[in-house]
Regions:
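Short amphipathic alpha-helix that is part of the acyltransferase structural core
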Residues: 1-15, 125-157
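A conserved beta-strand-loop-helix scaffold within acyl/acetyltransferase catalytic domains
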Residues: 8-11, 32-41, 155-204
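Acyl-donor-binding surface of acyltransferase catalytic domains
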Residues: 55-130, 258-266
Length: 267
């Protein structure tokens, strides 16, 4: 069994970040990749997060895992002053993989949690010099503009297909927060019937830690409540302090765990 890299980039990943496990007959027995993420807004205490995926026969697992960890240490060494975490994702029901990572020095403390928010009374107070308005998404350019703003604010899971599927739901709105006519944040909600999901929310870095996210989310929840929504859920990363703080502001309760993120700090 040996590890090889592709000759060309794969799905936007550099060849050196993609790994194939090949047996003595030349048959592929496993596949893995590693993705560098700089996320100071989501994880102020650990801005560099290296996500890896590993899939294949049990016989190839240790070899691929070792190669991925070695690559992670090379990536971490490029910016040794920045705290770095290496992590992956598994189902909460996958006890075998969980044990594998625990035995190899990972913790399984971080989870993708499903939460229900308490809908507050009233419309909420918008800060002085600020206004809110729906984000227009009628054209392809407007939709791409939203996706770009989400991406630069570390929200990468919303792509065009997903956004357009949300837009077709009975309850849908993207609400922007403006300070002195400048866009400083947006929130997306979508749902049907009495249920709605907080899909994403961001505040520009220069306006964070000033109550802007709380004010924007409060107003959006009031709008959805006026449409008949009585239940609002969302998903957060349990390790993200900013996400936890915002959820605490709305008395959120954990309904369940969607995913476990085994990981280890490299620095």
């Amino acid at each position: 069994m040996t590890i090889v890299h592709p000759a060309q980039p794969v799905n936007g990943l550099n060849p050196e970040d993609v790994f194939y496990a090949v047996d003595d007959l030349g048959t592929q027995a496993g596949y893995g990749f590693i993705l560098y993420q700089y996320q100071p807004g989501l994880y102020p205490d650990c801005p560099v997060n290296l996500y890896f995926s590993l899939d294949g026969d049990p016989s190839a697992r240790y070899l691929l895992f070792g190669a991925l960890v070695a690559r992670a240490r090379i990536l971490q060494a490029a910016n040794p002053a920045l705290r770095t975490r290496l992590y992956t994702s598994i189902s909460p029901a996958d006890i075998q993989l969980k044990d594998f990572y625990l035995q190899n020095g990972f913790d399984c403390d971080e989870t993708d949690n499903i939460l229900q928010l308490t809908i507050p009374f009233g419309d909420g107070r918008i800060p002085m010099s600020c206004t809110v308005a729906p984000t227009p998404l009628h054209t392809w350019d407007e939709q791409q503009g939203l996706l770009y703003r989400l991406k630069v604010n570390e929200i990468t899971f919303v792509d065009l297909d997903y956004l357009q599927s949300l837009m077709r739901m009975p309850h849908f709105m993207t609400l922007g927060l403006y300070r002195n006519a400048m866009l400083i944040g947006e929130v997306i909600m979508a749902g049907q019937g009495s249920d709605c999901e907080l899909v994403a929310i961001y505040i520009e870095p220069g306006s964070r830690n000033q109550g802007m996210g709380k004010a924007l989310l409060h107003r959006m929840m009031a709008i959805m409540a006026a449409e008949g929504v009585t239940r609002i859920t969302t998903r957060i990363m349990s390790r993200s302090i900013p996400q936890q703080r915002l959820m605490n502001d709305f008395g959120a309760t954990v309904l369940g765990v969607n995913m476990i993120f085994p990981g280890m700090y490299l620095s």
